[in-house]
């Protein structure tokens, strides 16, 4: 440490860099302390010296007002080197901003990092006060609790202790605790209020309790937590003759000319409180679901013969009551068809507090016989359920989920299991608004590769290119195949039907296959021989359209927009859609439906795509025979995009853009705008593909001259900014630098009018030139400029009549030795300048 030569000095240091971004006060503070001076962190009354450089104006004014000595940093340095207290008047401080107007306040921002000290109650008073306040509040809350109020506390080991202040016995249970215990003992459904308790009906003692809960909520329709179960309902339940076990759902109506004791195995669709069309009740089928299948062989026969055939109780008893697993292809019957008359299915709007519902349906089987629950892990695509009628009308007023029977197992345990967490959370959602006329589109999670392949294997693209129509394939089984004559008479199962454009007033339907989550609709067809319906949705079916069903014939026609390529179309492989029997003209079949396919699937998936499922009902060709054409045409449309993907991210734009005389900040802006608006690729130098040259400043650079010679647009930087503002590339003419470069618009017009590759004619009449190796710009660029303007360049000087640039060899009297500026000025002005002004000294 140096001698205390400045022991009587109390200094305040304010030393900044000239631009106000760096604070150097710490360095001089250390030097002053070493010399024995005291350094104050604030400008107080004890301060005797102010070391000032480019500091605040307020500090300068305060020092002048108090008469404190203002010295520069040179005074500190001189004292240190001399080892003595130097006179302050020799090194006065200077204030460069003293005479500047005070209206402009210069903001200072020190870029140096500060020392970070972690705040603790010990070193931070504010933090200490906050900490003490929180501790007092916590203590007050603990002492304010009454001793007789039971509370819940979590112990250190994670266990839950109930009311530690009072020993709990059976008499101190809360009302909710008693309610939970009662429901567990009685195996009742959980509900927070007594008004929603399930009232079991015991009118028919012969009915066995065969239940399996099914609650597919709005949220779980698109999740992996969906579960399904075997569904059992009696004919009496459907007719409203006996009450269901669950009062939340009521089934009523009448079916004429049938027996009241006939049992029907059916699905009950519970959707939102919405009036659907008379023909369909749609269900989101895009989610993989786990189905619980417990139907017997007899029930399968009932379900497959539900239309046009009456099964008596005697026949049912003869079929046997042995329970067996419902095979995968019989997972859920997508059709509930009525024979004659009217069938009404009503459902109350689902309240947010209803957790799980159980319904017991009568079925003639031993009373103690129970259904076994079994969860299937296989993911599948749920078809949209449809309620088809042959001679009557069908109404479906439903809530947001499929509902089935509760199983004999404990609903209490099911409710609190982790598997049902999503299901319980989704039930708190508010009811959806009324559906529009076209089917609702549900958001779904992104599909895996296996699911996308499964969807395409079972998709029918036959309706693409047609106007809105409905194709109903109901109860199409392997054992019982109904003929079109039965369909027309209303006794058989509904076959392929098509509503022509004259009959259907519904809005167009967009079939989409999308990889990411979003509004989407997907077609689905069951595997061959499954005996189930396949629906291409249309929101409505005309009321008068009972038995007059038109055969549907058609295959894929246009999928060119499916992969986003408008120009890709294989006319040889695409198949035309035949007209319906109503006599529609081909011109009426405009391609209004689009299958939006994700083109990022692997080539293996595309090769494995079978065709869609379509064909004439009368001829009944096999599905694979009918759909080879649609499959091939779809593959051909996808192949070009697949090749693009293999070769890279697509073909780069053929136009290039060159920047010149532009700082890096503007260059970054241009690059970002080009990335956003597309259409250009950035090049460093002007080349054959360059069409635009952007100049940050109107300077004559090589790129500008090359751009003029090639007939490019020479534009200002503002063109990019205005294009970004408009969201697209705008007209270039208002931003052309024609004032600074008159030749630019002239060469550009000549380039546009030229039939072949453009080459200027500026130097076409000039003799052969030789460009000196010592010329500037470089020889190669200068030769290129001369060539582009129609001139001829020789490699040796003896063949040339004009020598461009400094030449050190033997000079001839017949040869003109001109400066490089002659070429540059001639190109800029688009005329051959007088050579006398550019002669080099001999």
UniProtKB/Swiss-Prot annotation:
Modified positions (Phosphothreonine) in chain numbering: 335
Span list, region Disordered: 346-375, 418-443, 563-624
Pfam families to which the protein is assigned, alphabetical: Microcephalin (PF12258), PTCB-BRCT (PF12738)
Keywords: Cytoplasm, Cytoskeleton, Phosphoprotein, Repeat
SUPFAM superfamilies (alphabetical): BRCT domain (SSF52113)
Biased composition (Polar residues): 434-443, 566-582
Ranges annotated as biased composition (Basic residues): 346-359
Highest taxon above the source species: Eukaryota
Location (main, coarse): cytoplasm
Domain BRCT: 1-93, 647-737, 758-840
GO BP: cerebral cortex development; mitotic cell cycle
One annotated Gene Ontology cellular component of this protein: cytoplasm
Residues where Phosphoserine is found: 279, 287, 296, 333
Basic and acidic residues bias (residue ranges): 586-608
Entry annotated with the keyword Ion transport: no
Subcellular location as annotated: Cytoplasm, Cytoskeleton, Microtubule organizing center, Centrosome
Subunit-level organization: Interacts with CDC27 and maybe other components of the APC/C complex. Interacts with histone variant H2AX under DNA damage conditions.
Notes on the domains: BRCT domain 1 is required to prevent abnormal chromosome condensation. It binds directly to the SWI-SNF chromatin remodeling complex. BRCT domains 2 and 3 recognize phosphoserine/phosphothreonine marks on proteins with high selectivity, and mediate interaction with phosphorylated CDC27. They also mediate the dual recognition of phosphoserine and phosphotyrosine in the C-terminal tail of histone H2AX.
Functional note: Implicated in chromosome condensation and DNA damage induced cellular responses. May play a role in neurogenesis and regulation of the size of the cerebral cortex.
Name recorded for this polypeptide: Microcephalin
